[in-house]
């Protein structure tokens, strides 16, 4: 009898725990994805803060020339970063217990891999948690679908690109100037500005900003007056009210006359779907572009200059881009190799002639 009561009590405790985890009445929804998300994101955030402040220099290129990234080693908020794991480690899984000592782990940039792996798990679980909460509330799943765009982008620069290039040292540094350095080197090595998927991503981001500003300004300009001149227009809206707070017909008429009739949406649902889908699809394409360039399927190149009938080069914008790319590549890892790969791969002339 005692065993049965103990079993029922344990079962009841587990049932209460499950109910609490999946309850939509909590101030913050946890969910089963949250059980993984919370510790992974807390770990990534804690290690990032500690490493950004106090991590020792990292031998990023694997040539015994450490690069400092933390505040205590001479950097500021702009120049500071968590430096990627050493090229000497490559793609090997490098937890603390794989290193001979903590000093070796820090010297080889172990914190970067720890942060990136936990961050990746955390944001994936955050996306799953969005879907889980939507499911339990009876909502459609598009919030998680929209969030998949930044998840795909982060996965591309932190996971797929290092895999394609053969080393976590090629991942994006975790800092402001490190991000810009990553972008410049990416352009030098892959000519990303001439990749169609990057162009679609630019159209998605800037187009999304434009459409968001247009929508917000149209709605704000066509609010239904509910207040006096001495009150804020925001006081005219009560949370949960059934009435429309703006006149979509007026906004539609204004924009249709400003551009042309069919440039304006007359359906609020299709309008908001478009506002969500445009930047999401653009960022999906950018992430796909990064993922293909990770394996050196690069942007268009025009390495063969345009020449006239006499063989003289006719300088074009492509020549300027090529020179800029070579210049950026020369500055990158200047102590690891003497020339950019484009120049080093040229066959040397014979000296026996």
Swiss-Prot record:
PANTHER family with a match to the protein in the record: PHOTOSYSTEM II D2 PROTEIN (PTHR33149:SF12), PHOTOSYSTEM II PROTEIN D1 (PTHR33149)
Xref: Pfam families: Photo_RC
Function text: Photosystem II (PSII) is a light-driven water:plastoquinone oxidoreductase that uses light energy to abstract electrons from H(2)O, generating O(2) and a proton gradient subsequently used for ATP formation. It consists of a core antenna complex that captures photons, and an electron transfer chain that converts photonic excitation into a charge separation. The D1/D2 (PsbA/PsbD) reaction center heterodimer binds P680, the primary electron donor of PSII as well as several subsequent electron acceptors.
Co-factor note (free text): The D1/D2 heterodimer binds P680, chlorophylls that are the primary electron donor of PSII, and subsequent electron acceptors. It shares a non-heme iron and each subunit binds pheophytin, quinone, additional chlorophylls, carotenoids and lipids. D1 provides most of the ligands for the Mn4-Ca-O5 cluster of the oxygen-evolving complex (OEC). There is also a Cl(-1) ion associated with D1 and D2, which is required for oxygen evolution. The PSII complex binds additional chlorophylls, carotenoids and specific lipids.
Name under which the protein is recorded: Photosystem II protein D1
Site label Tyrosine radical intermediate, positions: 161
Residues that hold pheophytin a according to the record: 126
Site, Cleavage: residue positions: 344-345
UniProt GO cellular component terms: chloroplast thylakoid membrane; photosystem II
Quaternary assembly: PSII is composed of 1 copy each of membrane proteins PsbA, PsbB, PsbC, PsbD, PsbE, PsbF, PsbH, PsbI, PsbJ, PsbK, PsbL, PsbM, PsbT, PsbX, PsbY, PsbZ, Psb30/Ycf12, at least 3 peripheral proteins of the oxygen-evolving complex and a large number of cofactors. It forms dimeric complexes.
Source organism superkingdom: Eukaryota
Organism from which the protein derives: Tetradesmus obliquus (Green alga)
Residue spans crossing the bilayer: 29-46, 118-133, 142-156, 197-218, 274-288
């Amino acid at each position: 009898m005692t065993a049965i009561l103990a079993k029922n009590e344990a079962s009841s405790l587990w049932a209460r725990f499950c109910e609490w985890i999946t309850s939509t009445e909590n101030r913050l929804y946890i969910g089963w994805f949250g059980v993984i998300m919370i510790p992974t994101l807390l770990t990534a955030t804690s290690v990032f803060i500690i490493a950004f402040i106090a991590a020792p220099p990292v031998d990023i290129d694997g040539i015994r020339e450490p690069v400092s990234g933390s505040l205590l080693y001479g950097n500021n908020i702009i120049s500071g970063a968590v430096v990627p794991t050493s090229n000497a480690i490559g793609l090997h899984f490098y937890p603390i217990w794989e290193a001979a000592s903590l000093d070796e782990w820090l010297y080889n940039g172990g914190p970067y891999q720890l942060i990136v792996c936990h961050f990746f798990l955390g944001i994936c679980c955050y996306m799953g948690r969005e879907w889980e909460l939507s499911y339990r509330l009876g909502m459609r799943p598009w919030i998680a679908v929209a969030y998949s765009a930044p998840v795909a982008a982060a996965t591309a620069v932190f996971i797929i690109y290092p895999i394609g290039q053969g080393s976590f040292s090629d991942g994006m540094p975790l800092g402001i100037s490190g991000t810009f350095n990553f972008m410049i080197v990416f352009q030098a090595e892959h000519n990303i500005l001439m990749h169609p998927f990057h162009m679609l991503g630019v159209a998605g981001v800037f187009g999304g900003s434009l459409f968001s500003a247009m929508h917000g300004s149209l709605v704000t300009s066509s609010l239904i007056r509910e207040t006096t001149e001495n009150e804020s227009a925001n006081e005219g809206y009560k949370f949960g009210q059934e009435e429309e707070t703006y006149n979509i017909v007026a906004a539609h008429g204004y924009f249709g006359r400003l551009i042309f009739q069919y440039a304006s949406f007359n359906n609020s649902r299709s309008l908001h779907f478009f506002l969500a889908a445009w930047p999401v699809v653009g960022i999906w394409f950018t992430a796909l572009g990064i993922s293909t360039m990770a394996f050196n399927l690069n942007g268009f190149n025009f390495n063969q200059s345009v020449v006239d009938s006499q063989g003289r080069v006719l300088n074009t914008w492509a020549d300027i881009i090529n020179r800029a790319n070579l210049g950026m590549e020369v500055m990158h890892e200047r102590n690891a190799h003497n020339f950019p790969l484009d120049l080093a791969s040229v066959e040397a002339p014979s000296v026996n002639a």
